């Protein structure tokens, strides 16, 4: 079982598209769950998630609330609620590819000693990439990173974005 943990705070604009992208995954819905941690949302995030759950009864979605504000508290709540052997954090403003869950499952099956994994992070701009954006500022401001398709250790001295 794989658990996708999504921690959210007032992201009604983004949470629906994210959940829709997860619903399009080619991984069996019986083999993953979504734990969505509401970190005191005051917008319509909950309503959007409830509508998604109604529209997709085949997807195991757990909506929980964490009243202690902050990403660390929300992630810890997600871990407590998770039933999966593999935990994948997904940012609440992200979109995932249709093979996203399967690729993680295949990676952990092929590399059982792996303790953490990640993949490319590509920014999605609402219009177009600003002309002033350079590779340096892109990595700094958007968490963009791509170390290629080869399995390897994360570079020492670098930190995952997000």
Residue ranges and their predicted role:
Residues 1-3, 33:
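Cell-envelope/extracellular polymer assembly enzymes that use nucleotide-activated donors
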Residues 31-40, 62-66:
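Short beta-strand/loop segment that forms part of the nucleotide-sugar
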Residues 66-82:
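Glycine-rich, basic loop-to-helix element that forms the pyrophosphate-binding segment
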Residues 87:
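Short aromatic/hydrophobic "clamp" motif used to bind/position activated sugar donors
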Residues 137-161:
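Short, flexible, basic/aromatic active-site loop/helix in glycosyltransferases
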């Amino acid at each position: 079982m794989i658990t996708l943990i999504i921690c959210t705070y007032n992201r009604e604009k983004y949470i629906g598209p994210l959940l829709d992208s997860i619903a399009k995954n080619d991984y069996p819905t019986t083999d993953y769950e979504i734990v969505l941690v509401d970190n005191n949302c005051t917008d319509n995030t909950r309503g959007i998630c409830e509508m998604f759950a109604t529209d997709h009864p085949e997807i195991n979605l757990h909506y929980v609330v964490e009243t202690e504000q902050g990403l660390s508290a929300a992630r810890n709540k997600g871990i407590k609620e998770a039933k999966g052997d593999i935990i994948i954090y997904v940012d609440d403003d992200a979109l995932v590819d249709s093979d996203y869950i399967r690729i993680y499952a295949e990676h952990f099956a092929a590399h059982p000693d792996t303790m953490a994994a990640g993949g490319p992070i590509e920014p999605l701009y609402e219009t177009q990439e600003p002309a002033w954006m350079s590779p340096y500022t892109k990595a700094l401001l958007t968490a963009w990173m791509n170390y290629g398709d080869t399995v390897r250790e994360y570079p020492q001295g670098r930190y995952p974005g997000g």
